[in-house]
Amino acid sequence: MSKQWQAAARVFEFLMESQHWPAADLRDYQLQQLEQLLRHARAQVPYYNKSLAPVFRGDGSINFGRWHELPILKREDLAQNPDAFNAASVPQNHGKVSEFRTSGSTGHPVVARHTWPAGQCRKALP
């Protein structure tokens, strides 16, 4: 089994286990994961370095009470400045970065980059 499929199997096992967690434990875990994602995005992605500023306090902690102040990302934002959305680096265990393109049928074709796990999640969600 490839490393990618081993990682997918671990995610599946985790989901099967965590579906039975108490709501408070699940919420705590989700907030912890969201904090890691926000810190990575702010540190590595030019667009998010600026746009996430309202939720970060001076000490680096995150104020989720200001979440409503974050700008809504629009498709044209991605189309007009795709390089601003590219992470300078991704965690090594996330694998190779690949590019995908949309058809542009909406009038705003988008070119984006993702790792294999992110691409699989994108395919799995409606």
What does each of the following model-derived ranges do?
Residues 1-101, 107-126:
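Nucleotide 5′-phosphate-binding alpha/beta core
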